[in-house]
């Protein structure tokens, strides 16, 4: 983990009339175990992809302010790698929460713009409570050594506390007005010139949640039309002014979505999410 962020996929851009600039890179933040092994299993996403691992994985150090401290540190890593332009942020499980915090930090950055967030089966935590339905995920190599398992377990224990104690950042509200049958989103800036608006976000949700009423695999729902919003949005419907555009199902459960039989479909969903978010920016 010496290289951080580590290059996971390199996109060789060919300039053409339709797309002169290379696609915005995607920075994926580690899972609860602190590693980025799972992201190396993804098929091509059509853009450069970096993985950010937990630098405390090999040490006894902890993060003083949890997710907030992690996000601040990771933002510096991102800026050192990609100082200016448009980027996408994302992550599996805990990584999705850190991505939200990092996007908030970067919201007023004059050089770097977060055009979207891609969360992979992340759950919005209730402060002070541990979510039992979807636990924090991690993925280790199949040849995990006892030492590696112990380090991963340490990160997992910390991640549970960090998730439980996380105070989600505040976002400014946005309003949608319809002009000539075209929906346009405008920022509401009444009495608030400091709080930023949230970048558009896609939540990729594991289809198998352990119940018998799983939805159709190909269903893609704007969150405002979901009849079961809390389940469908994994609690993010409770997050005030959070700009969750779509919830997309992918096969598998929280722990098997990166398995061989599921990762092709997951890769497709992540790629489609990135492409949609960039188009809306």
Swiss-Prot record:
Keywords: Hydrolase. GO terms for biological process: biosynthetic process. InterPro entries: AB_hydrolase_fold (IPR029058), Thioesterase (IPR001031). Its EC number is 3.1.-.-. GO terms for molecular function: hydrolase activity. Pathway: Mycotoxin biosynthesis. Pfam families: Thioesterase. Probable thioesterase; part of the gene cluster that mediates the biosynthesis of pneumocandins, lipohexapeptides of the echinocandin family that prevent fungal cell wall formation by non-competitive inhibition of beta-1,3-glucan synthase. The 10,12-dimethylmyristoyl side chain is synthesized by the reducing polyketide synthase gloL/GLPKS4. The thioesterase gloN/GLHYD exclusively interacts with gloL/GLPKS4 to maintain turnover of the polyketide side chain. Belongs to the AMT4 thioesterase family. This is Probable thioesterase gloN. It comes from Glarea lozoyensis (strain ATCC 20868 / MF5171). The gene is gloN.
């Amino acid at each position: 983990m010496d290289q951080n962020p580590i290059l996971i996929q390199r996109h060789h851009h060919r300039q053409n009339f339709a797309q002169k600039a290379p696609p915005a890179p995607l920075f994926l933040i580690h899972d609860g175990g602190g590693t980025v092994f799972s992201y190396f299993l993804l098929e091509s996403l059509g853009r450069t992809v970096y993985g950010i691992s937990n630098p405390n994985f090999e040490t006894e150090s902890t993060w003083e302010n949890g997710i907030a401290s992690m996000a601040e540190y990771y933002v510096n890593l991102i800026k050192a790698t990609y100082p200016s332009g448009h980027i996408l942020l994302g992550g599996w499980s805990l990584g999705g929460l850190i991505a939200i915090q990092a996007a908030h930090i970067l919201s007023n950055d004059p050089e770097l713009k977060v055009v979207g967030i891609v969360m992979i089966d992340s759950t919005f935590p209730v402060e002070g409570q541990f979510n039992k339905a979807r636990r924090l995920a991690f993925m280790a190599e199949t040849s995990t050594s006892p030492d590696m398992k112990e380090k991963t377990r340490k990160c997992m224990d910390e991640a549970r506390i960090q998730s439980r104690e996380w105070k989600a950042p505040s976002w400014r509200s946005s309003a949608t007005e319809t002009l000539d049958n075209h929906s346009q989103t405008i920022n509401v800036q009444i009495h608030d010139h400091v709080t930023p608006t949230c970048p558009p976000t896609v939540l990729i949700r594991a289809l198998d949640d352990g119940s018998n009423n799983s939805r159709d695999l190909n269903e893609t729902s704007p969150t405002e039309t979901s009849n079961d919003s809390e389940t469908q949005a994994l609690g993010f419907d409770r997050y005030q002014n959070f700009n969750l555009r779509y919830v997309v199902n992918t096969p598998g459960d929280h722990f098997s979505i990166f398995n061989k039989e599921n990762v092709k479909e997951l890769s497709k969903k992540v790629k489609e999410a990135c492409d949609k978010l960039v188009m809306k920016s």
